[in-house]
Amino acid sequence: MVMRQNNRTAESLRPISIERGVQLHADASVLIRMGNTHVICGVSVEESVPPFMRGSGKGWITAEYGMLPCATDSRYRRETNGRSGRTMEIQRLIGRSLRMMVDLETIGERTLRVDCDVLNADGGTRTASITGGALALRDAFTKLHTTGLLEKMPEIMPVVAISVGMKDGQALLDLDYVEDSSADADANFVMAGDGRWIEVQSTAEGRPFSHDQFLAMADLAQKGSAELLQLWRDQE
């Protein structure tokens, strides 16, 4: 059995905590901590939609992602001249995942913008952003309903995400930065509350991985996602 930092097994998540309502001026917010990765997810509701959605009767959910300068071991420069390709890729992943939570026709022609800001980065920032952002969105929908802006509470599909890697033939759940930087392969799995996959991103780093190794990573992601879904239910 592989033993990792903090006596984690290959199948163990890092310690997780959820703090809700941490931003005074957000419509909803969540601070999610997964080990030493900490991400604050704030939701802003705008009573309009992008031009391509106008007149459709549908709402829109989008996301922005960024890291604070001291989130990493060496100062991360603010992206003042436009977002990098990596940042754009991550925030599109977050947005696609979060749009799976609801039928956009049930939220009216309004935009819910989810800002995911990484306070501390130790691997898995995009997956933590998805899980935390989804929890914050749920609270935002509840607020819209209780304040009368939404006549009916939309049916919400829980959404969670987790990383898995392959190191020396062993699948590892919820990689920290050291593990991620030395993995032979890594993957991000986004799961809906009914157990179906929303998105899977998997890349070989040191060497190609086999079909069986991919299935081992998927099985581990399924286990970790089930634990995150239980966390979601515990927050209800």
Curated annotation (Swiss-Prot):
Protein name, UniProt field: Ribonuclease PH
> Which reactions is this enzyme annotated as catalysing?
tRNA(n+1) + phosphate = tRNA(n) + a ribonucleoside 5'-diphosphate
| Quaternary structure, from the entry | Homohexameric ring arranged as a trimer of dimers.
Keywords in alphabetical order, please: Nucleotidyltransferase, RNA-binding, rRNA processing, Transferase, tRNA processing, tRNA-binding
Q: What is its EC number?
A: 2.7.7.56
What the entry lists under Gene3D superfamilies is as follows:
GHMP Kinase, N-terminal domain
Lineage runs: Bacteria, Pseudomonadati, Thermodesulfobacteriota, Desulfobulbia, Desulfobulbales
What biological process terms from GO does the record include? rRNA catabolic process; rRNA processing; tRNA processing
This protein's record includes keyword Transferase:
yes
Record-annotated disulphide pairs: none
